[in-house]
Amino acid sequence: MIPEQGEHKAFVQRNTNETKIQIAISLNGGHIEIPESIIGKKRVESDGVATQATSSQTIDIHTGVGFLDHMIHALAKHSGWSLIVECIGDLHIDDHHTTEDCGIALGDAFKQALGQVRGVKRFGFGFAPLDEALSRAVVDLSNRPYSVIELGLKREKIGDLSCEMIPHFLESFTEAARLTVHVDCLRGFNDHHRSESAFKALAVALREATSPNGTNDVPSTKGVLM
């Protein structure tokens, strides 16, 4: 849990000619809501797979791309976030704009919710297995956006999400959040498992990086981050 120097919540809207997105996030979990849904009657019977409400978290992901919903759900769950994501995108073209813009909007929301990097560990790493797959993620809340994502995916698609867009989502998130992120899938033969273990490993790393370090200091020799 992030030190209680603020609510660590954000509400972000991103509207372009390609996508319309709104995101509500609380990095410490708890109750969140959005002013008004943009999805409405566009919800379908398959919706609800990436929806979860517990005493500590509210998660509701609707991007229009099922496997992307699944990955963002895993990221939020294991990061300890409460997260609502709604997107209406130009999926009649392909999944590129929706996936990329959701990554950008989520990164922006994370950055706004985090605020000044103070009193946290700054660095975090995590390993996550999923059956035969094992992934490692290393994070720096650096204000220096850079990512190296090596998932080794072989399939063209998982569900309705192009495999090339899976690392690109993580790259887009990293850039907007202004993080340094390295994610590597170390082993595994099932691309679903490889991808999911990578998102879970990133969640573990983010949770550690944003956890208290026992001070109220900025964890940098520069004296400022973000």
Curated annotation (Swiss-Prot):
One of its GO terms (biological process) is L-histidine biosynthetic process. Pathway: Amino-acid biosynthesis; L-histidine biosynthesis; L-histidine from 5-phospho-alpha-D-ribose 1-diphosphate: step 6/9. Keywords: Amino-acid biosynthesis, Histidine biosynthesis, Lyase. Pfam families: IGPD. Coiled coil: none annotated. Its EC number is 4.2.1.19. It catalyses: D-erythro-1-(imidazol-4-yl)glycerol 3-phosphate = 3-(imidazol-4-yl)-2-oxopropyl phosphate + H2O. One of its GO terms (molecular function) is imidazoleglycerol-phosphate dehydratase activity. Disulfide bonds: none annotated. Belongs to the imidazoleglycerol-phosphate dehydratase family. NCBIfam families: PRK00951.2-4 (NF002114). This is Imidazoleglycerol-phosphate dehydratase. The lineage of its organism: Eukaryota, Fungi, Dikarya, Ascomycota, Saccharomycotina.
